[in-house]
């Protein structure tokens, strides 16, 4: 049928592109995402990336610093959402008829204009750039952490349980600022370009004045999420 070649080197910013093929009166199109090659992501002096609020992270928060808590896949306790099977695809038929067959969720909702997602092109719903994040994550029952905090990225729960679930949210701990991620940003990152771009987007956000959590929670509440 032929081939298509396109040089991506001139694309300097993250972008969602559309390839459309037209033959006579028939057309089809496909979305794909291009992310510039990033240098290895390392913790800046201003932000600590961790999977648990240990003494170093707690000291950072108490001194007014910034911490990105990224939960490792499989470490979220069941009572906080660890028993919910998140899926990129939605529930098949319904979980009552399938005896709780996975997945237990119905995609995500987010504000595409939220500054945390600025260098991560997205619609308000999940698309294929979210596949990696959702397959390396757990949905957090945010109402058990804070009654006031709102998700940056919301996971839609099964309509039978309808728990408020978050993939990303932010809170204030003492003088410090904490971004909590149900997405695992630790494992196999060299093989996950979409995850690297999303992490870069979050770190850029945390380094900006837009990152200003208002709702206060206790350190013990956050650490209770994790099954160590």
What is the meaning of each model-derived region?
Residues 12-25:
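Short, aromatic- and glycine-rich surface loops/edge beta-strands on solvent-exposed regions
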Residues 26, 53, 163-165:
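Residues that act as N-cap/strand-start positions at coil-to-secondary-structure junctions
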Residues 44-94, 172-177, 181, 202:
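Short alpha-beta junction capping motif
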Residues 14, 76-77, 94-193, 211-228:
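Catalytic beta-strand/loop cores that center a nucleophilic Ser/Cys/Thr
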Residues 26-38:
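Edge beta-strands of extracellular beta-sandwich domains
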Residues 38-42, 207-215:
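Short, charged low-complexity linker/loop segments at the C-terminal edge of domains
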Residues 1-14:
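Intrinsically disordered, low-complexity Pro/Gly/Ser/Thr-rich segments with frequent PxxP/GP/PP motifs
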Residues 194-207:
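Short amphipathic C-terminal alpha-helix that caps PH/PH-like domains
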């Amino acid at each position: 049928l032929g081939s298509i070649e396109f040089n991506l080197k001139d694309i300097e910013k993250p972008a969602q592109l559309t390839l459309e093929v037209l033959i006579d009166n028939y057309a089809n199109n496909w979305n794909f995402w291009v992310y510039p090659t990033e240098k290895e992501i390392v913790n800046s002096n201003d932000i600590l990336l961790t999977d648990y609020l240990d003494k170093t992270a707690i000291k950072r928060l108490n001194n007014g610093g910034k911490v990105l808590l990224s939960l490792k896949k499989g470490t979220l306790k069941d009572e906080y959402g660890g028993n919910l099977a998140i899926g990129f695809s939605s529930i098949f038929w319904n979980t009552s008829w399938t005896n709780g067959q996975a997945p237990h969720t119905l995609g995500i909702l987010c504000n595409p204009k939220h500054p945390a997602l600025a260098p991560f092109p997205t619609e308000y719903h999940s698309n294929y750039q979210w596949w990696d994040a959702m397959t390396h994550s757990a949905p957090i029952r945010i109402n058990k952490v804070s009654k006031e905090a709102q998700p940056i990225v919301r996971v839609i729960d099964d309509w039978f349980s309808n728990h408020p679930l978050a993939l990303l949210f932010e809170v204030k701990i003492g003088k410090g600022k904490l971004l909590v991620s149900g997405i695992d940003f630790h494992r196999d990152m060299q093989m996950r370009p979409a995850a690297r771009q999303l992490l870069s987007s979050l770190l850029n956000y945390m380094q900006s004045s837009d990152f200003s959590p208002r709702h206060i929670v206790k350190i013990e509440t956050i650490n209770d999420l994790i099954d160590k």
